[in-house]
Design a protein with these regions (language model features):
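Glycosyltransferase catalytic domains, chiefly GT-A lineage
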Residues: 1-224
Length: 224
């Protein structure tokens, strides 16, 4: 979907972070992308980068692959800026426009996580307490969703080395794993993007029941 919406005037360098994609499937992906004259694909095996780290997740639907974001800055040493997309994204526009976002020197460009932000205002106070005492966020309403990221790799390298990122990831108590860590460590260096760049659809009726507990102006921006 990304390449079907790509601009013919731009080149798209697709880099797949992986550990165990078979040679056959790599060839299938390569052959598929060959139909697009302005795209190339490469595969980067992260096995050595994560070797020796005890990485786990707290959610059954989240795999160890979620930590691959932390490896990008080392895997692509000559890149200053990249666009990270979760592999399950459906793209309806030209991501080159998103890549061109001026981050103003910030480390991350990302869309606010309307679900998390709605949870901050729940009466039980669990999420608000977590954001304050575990993530130590000064402004938890700036919490972002990490499925789509414009990454300033130079700034990310200044914040932490890959080893430091992964050492933090080994610590217990993170609910949303690497997403929590990015929010905790990059707070104050985030450019918030329009919601249309990472639309969270209504799952289990959470739009009207969780998301609508977010501040009114934020929820309206999401709905628009």
């Amino acid at each position: 979907s990304m390449l079907r919406n790509a601009s013919p005037e731009r080149h798209y360098d697709v880099i797949v972070l992986e550990r165990n994609i078979s040679a056959e499937n790599k060839q299938n992906i390569t052959d598929f992308l060959a139909q697009f004259g302005n795209a190339t694909v490469r595969f980067y095996d992260v096995s050595r980068a994560i070797d020796g780290f005890n990485l786990t997740t707290n959610n059954a639907h989240i795999s160890i692959e979620t930590y691959y974001r932390f490896i990008i800055q080392e895997a692509l040493p000559f890149y200053k800026k990249v666009l990270y997309l979760d592999c399950d994204m459906v793209v309806n526009g030209d991501v080159a426009e998103l890549y061109d976002t001026d981050l103003g020197g910030n480390a991350i460009g990302a869309v606010p996580d309307i679900d998390f932000i709605g949870n901050l205002n729940m009466k039980d106070g669990i999420c608000a307490e977590y954001a304050k005492h575990r993530l130590h966020m000064k402004n938890p309403y700036g919490y972002f969703q990490a499925g789509v990221l414009v990454m300033n790799l130079e700034k990310m390298r200044e914040i932490h080395s890959v080893r430091e990122w992964l050492e933090i990831a080994q610590q217990p108590g993170f609910i949303y794993n690497d997403q929590d860590i990015l929010n905790m460590e990059c707070e104050g260096s985030v450019t918030h993007l329009p919601y249309e760049w990472n639309v969270m659809h209504d799952c289990d009726g959470r739009v009207h029941g969780v998301c609508d507990f977010a501040p009114a102006h934020m929820f309206q921006e999401y709905m628009d």
